[in-house]
């Protein structure tokens, strides 16, 4: 009987380890998705100095089909258009910044743990990234002047306090 108990405990421990590794992989893939989406949108639409042309017509069909800017795994066909989903099974919403010189990307349906991890993404890439604000659950948690930001220092404590719902959302602001 003791051997069976030990084997059971070891099996449960192994299952927990595998589950944690799988969750870390999904967060890593979601991190890649937001970075790839941002990089692709900025690369295609930044030439005119604003992102107004991105929002002409059906933005999701443009991102997934016409310009093929969104990573394929994020594009989910819905009727005659598309919706975007991230690897953590939540929605992805694109929006205009207040002045149309930038855009926002919102990841929805995030657990507290995943919200905290994604809010602390390191945005330094090729010496410059054009992120200037982050909101968690529609509340601004960080804002920087519109200049090249080399890092985005949101502490784990700030993230943990802000990611206080069962389902959280993060909105990143880019220009």
Describe the function of each predicted region:
Residues 1-26, 30-33:
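N-terminal single-pass transmembrane signal-anchor helix
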Residues 1-2, 37, 118:
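Long, contiguous hydrophobic alpha-helical segments, chiefly transmembrane helices and signal peptides
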Residues 21, 30-52:
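N-terminal alpha-helical signal peptides/signal-anchor transmembrane segments
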Residues 47-175:
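Periplasmic/extracellular, small/polar-rich flexible segments of pilin-like filament-forming proteins
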